[in-house]
C-alpha cells in the first residue's frame, strides 16, 4: 500500500508518517533524502534521527531512491521516504534528468511490495515564484505530486498537525505481497 503524506513546513508530516510506519507491523526502513549543506540542516537531520526508533534501518540516499525501493521493498518491510521535495532539490542541484528519475521512481513504486510511505512538502499553495529556478522547482514538485497522488492508495494533507484525508483507502484495495 502506498501512503502519500503532504503538507506545509512544520505541519506534522514526518511525525504522522512515522506513526503510520510504527503501526504498520513491518520492519521499517527509513530512506532519508536530506543533505546537510549547513549547520541548521545538520541539526534538523540529527533531530529527526533521534526521534526515530533505534530498530529502524536508515538509508541516506539523496538521489537514487528508486534503487533503494527496488532492493528493499518486500511484504515484511515498510519503507518511509522523507522527503520528495528535498529529492527534487537534489536532482536540480546535480543537474539530473528529473523526468528520467521521476519515471524510475514511479516504476519502482508501481512494482513495490509491502507498505510505502512518502512524505513531501506542498509547494503549490502560494504565489507563483519570481525566480526561474524556484518556479521550475515548484513546477517539478507539483507534477511529481500529481503522479504520486494518482498512484497512491491514500493521500493525506497535514494541516497544523491534523491529518486531512484527501484520498481515502479504497475498500477494494488489494495489498501486494
Model-predicted regions and their roles:
Residues 2-71:
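Conserved P-loop
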Residues 1, 75-78, 112-119:
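Loop/turn-to-beta-strand initiation segments
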Residues 17, 48, 80, 121, ...:
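Residue-level signal for inorganic ion chemistry
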Residues 28, 79, 154-157:
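Short, well-ordered beta-strand core segments
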Residues 54-101:
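Helix-adjacent hinge/juxtasegments
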Residues 25, 51-53, 74, 111-113, ...:
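Short, well-ordered coil/turn elements that cap or connect secondary structure elements
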Residues 12, 36-43, 75, 79, ...:
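Residues at secondary-structure transition points
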Amino acid at each position: 500500500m502506498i501512503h502519500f503524506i503532504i503538507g506545509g513546513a512544520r505541519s506534522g508530516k514526518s511525525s504522522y508518517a512515522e506513526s503510520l510506519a510504527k503501526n504498520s507491523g513491518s520492519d521499517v526502513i527509513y530512506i532519508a533524502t536530506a543533505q546537510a549543506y549547513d549547520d541548521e540542516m545538520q541539526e534538523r537531520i540529527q533531530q529527526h534521527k533521534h526521534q526515530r526508533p533505534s530498530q529502524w534501518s536508515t538509508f541516506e540516499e539523496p538521489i537514487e531512491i528508486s534503487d533503494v525501493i527496488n532492493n528493499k521493498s518486500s511484504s515484511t518491510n515498510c519503507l518511509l521516504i522523507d522527503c520528495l521535495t528535498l529529492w527534487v532539490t537534489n536532482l536540480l542541484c546535480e543537474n539530473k534528468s528529473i523526468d528520467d528519475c521521476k519515471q524510475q521512481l514511479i516504476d519502482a513504486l508501481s512494482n513495490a511490495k509491502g507498505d510505502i510511505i512518502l512524505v513531501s512538502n506542498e509547494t503549490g499553495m502560494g504565489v507563483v515564484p519570481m525566480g526561474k529556478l524556484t518556479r521550475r522547482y515548484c513546477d517539478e514538485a507539483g507534477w511529481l505530486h500529481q503522479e504520486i497522488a494518482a498512484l497512491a492508495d491514500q493521500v493525506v494533507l497535514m494541516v497544523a498537525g491534523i491529518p486531512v484525508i484527501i484520498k481515502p483507502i479504497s475498500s477494494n484495495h488489494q495489498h501486494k505481497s
